[in-house]
From Swiss-Prot:
The gene is gatA. SUPFAM superfamilies: Amidase signature (AS) enzymes (SSF75304). One of its GO terms (molecular function) is glutaminyl-tRNA synthase (glutamine-hydrolyzing) activity. The active site is at K69, S144, S168. GO terms for biological process: translation. The keyword DNA repair does not apply. Pfam families: Amidase. Allows the formation of correctly charged Gln-tRNA(Gln) through the transamidation of misacylated Glu-tRNA(Gln) in organisms which lack glutaminyl-tRNA synthetase. The reaction takes place in the presence of glutamine and ATP through an activated gamma-phospho-Glu-tRNA(Gln). It catalyses: L-glutamyl-tRNA(Gln) + L-glutamine + ATP + H2O = L-glutaminyl-tRNA(Gln) + L-glutamate + ADP + phosphate + H(+). InterPro entries: Amidase (IPR000120), Amidase_CS (IPR020556), Amidase_dom (IPR023631), AS_sf (IPR036928), GatA (IPR004412). One of its GO terms (cellular component) is glutamyl-tRNA(Gln) amidotransferase complex. PROSITE patterns: AMIDASES. This is Glutamyl-tRNA(Gln) amidotransferase subunit A.
Amino acid sequence: MTKWLSISDVKEKIAATSAEEVTASYLELIDKSSINGYTCTSDGALDTAKMVDKGEVAGPLAGVPIAIKDNISTKGLATTCSSKILEGYVPPYDAHVIERLKEAGAVIIGKTNMDEFAMGTSTESSCYGVTLNPWDHERVPGGSSGGSAAVVAAGEAPISLGSDTGGSVRCPAAFCGVVGLKPTYGAVSRYGLISYANSLEQIGPMATCVEDIAAVMDVIGGYDARDSTSIDKKIDHQAALIDDVKGLKIGVPDEYFGEGVDSGTENAVWDAINKYEEMDASWEKVSMPNTKYALAAYYTIAMSEASSNLARFDGTRYGPRNDGENWHVMASKTRAENFGKEVQRRILLGTYALSAGYQDKYYLKALQVRTLVKQDFDRAFANFDVLMAPTMPLPAFKIGEMVEDPLSQYLIDVNTVPMNLAGVPCISVPCGSSDGLPVGLQIIGNHFDEAALIRAAYSFEKNTDHHKARPGEVA
């Protein structure tokens, strides 16, 4: 079977052969893979495919395999957040997005590797070991949804789901040369997502083309009463697949370029922006002055929420349990021995930020900065349809390069965390290369204006070939 199939390609293969044969081909690719992108595959995948062939399962994604990040609950299929503390945990229910995918006929083919509890930018903190970037096996795939991006880039799944708390869909999409969308906060239900930071994260799709992103969003998007942050606003993503950006007003934030940005990355992004000008869009620079405070505010908020969210993992109900003479000793030993170093670091920092005497100084100040960052976006979208910037300031770095310096990893999230603070949607699309490694163009839209993102990204794809580049070649 040919690798790197789109949804429409998969449907053609199914029509020519069968859903069972297509699913079996993907399972064979996964079995032979050397990138460590999956944590497990689904025993029920072939059964679902057979049901599609019999006409017992139908829908817009009938028979299409999809890979799921390991922090999204899948009934009967292990969901561990790539952490020892959830070893062996099998959810008794499906996340809302999984319910939607199954209703649409999709085949859940397996779970993908990730940074432990979605805390990281490299997938190096996984208890299953690092996922390798398909473009260069000595480099990271990005994170925290590194497995989800890598398996799509390697042709081991046509589409995947990740989660994005501060860039965790867009970063690996950029590093692996695929398309990744972070929807507006509230546009996709978080029911069944094992939370890192509730007020920041969203589930989003990854694929080799914008068309597939739109198709998946039309399935998983929409209101869910079980998620109190879910907003009842219907968006027709596929209707926005229009190759026309004439009159599109693009804002280019000064603060997302310059010092710290790799020159090859910056050149590729400017080439992309100039391409839009050739396509009759217009661009203008814009200042977003509070960007310089966003990173500190983001990590203060995210770690504070993490310290609260992860308090529930203590070995009492699931996962490994260490012996102790009482509950406190048992829980303390269990957490100390089964949470990884990065997760422990973030829990400690978050607990400190929320502690008596420091909450006003750090956490509440961070919330005030969050409002200022959102106001920057509000002002920008009063004049522009979309904003454009590099997704990441540099291409994929080498495995182990930043492990001993966590602050350096935090800093490279500088271009992605502001959108999570503001809750606005954004998409990363391949726009070229730097030293033979993929570069992502980040397109940012106003709240619930995913249509503008998809239209802009789709038009770029139709007029360039960057999204067609595959590991082993450069567009």
